Regions:
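Conserved "landmark" site that anchors the functional core of diverse proteins
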Residues: 1-264
């Protein structure tokens, strides 16, 4: 199941079924990471530039990927499972929240009204660079759609002259010269990238405080996950006794370690 650590042995085969639950994508993580040459401190693949990963391309049948050596902690996590209520993801059918930005005045009032009242469809042209939507045309003011190129953050809602929203994703360019009406909040971004071509999308307004609150919620979920991971290892593999002097005796796999702790 998801959110679970599984110990694999030589010859084991992992299989996946179709999309189920909250989205169409899942993540398979390897303790120790993948053992491939990093590019700019990353082992990810950027297919457009043909760099990173395995020869800068998508994986294909027959590829062999070496796995790095996991740390001692990860070796003890067989059977560990995170509770599903730890997932901060929002309702997959909820409207996506947009924090409007400085270029909002480049759009007419009618255009902005249409954006937040209309339903859009994700097109088949969507990729890791951007999610292209089709629906009601968003009208610009006399200023037009072109601007002096500026930075494009993750989740920016860019609207070129054709009036169709494009939400910028992980492989987006660093700068662009089209107007951006705003940016999605963190949890709305997570919901968006789980959608498939043909999925319906609606939007609502949000403010900066909501985006900050979502980011804090994600950070708290990560903190709790780490805490539960350590608790699992401590409960299943470690025995410890403590003296009143701040001195610890820690026993791990039969080996005894003397530890002194001082509060600072």
């Amino acid at each position: 199941g998801s959110w679970r650590a599984v110990v694999l042995n030589d010859g084991d085969v992992i299989t996946f079924k179709g999309p189920k639950g909250k989205g169409c994508r899942g993540n398979l993580c390897f303790a120790g990471g993948v053992d491939i040459p990093p590019v700019m401190n990353s082992c990810s693949t950027y297919i457009r530039a043909k760099i990173g990963g395995v020869e800068g391309r998508a994986l294909k049948v027959g590829d062999v990927i070496k796995i790095g050596e996991p740390t001692a902690l990860w070796k003890k996590l067989g059977g560990f499972c995170l509770p599903e209520d730890l997932d901060p993801a929002q309702d997959a059918n909820a409207p996506l929240a947009i924090i409007t930005g400085l270029q909002e005045d480049a759009f007419t009032e009618e255009g902005k009204k249409l954006l937040f009242e209309s339903e859009y469809t994700m097109t088949a042209e969507s990729d890791r660079m951007g999610c292209r939507l089709e629906g009601a045309k968003i009208e610009h003011t006399e200023k037009g759609a072109d601007i002096v190129s500026d930075a494009i953050p993750l989740g920016a809602v860019q609207i070129p002259g054709h009036g169709m929203p494009i939400i910028m994703l992980a492989d987006r360019q660093t700068t662009g010269g089209y107007t951006k009406i705003g940016v999605l909040t963190p949890l709305s971004m997570e919901a968006l990238v789980q959608k498939m071509p043909g999925s319906k999308v609606r939007f609502r307004r949000a403010d900066v405080s909501e985006g900050v609150a979502e980011q804090m919620k994600i950070k708290e979920a990560v903190r709790r996950a780490r805490e539960l991971r350590l608790s699992h290892v401590s409960r299943t593999h470690i025995e410890a006794s403590r003296s009143l002097s701040g001195h610890f005796t820690l026993t791990v796999e039969g080996k005894r370690y003397e530890i002194t702790c001082e509060e600072i």
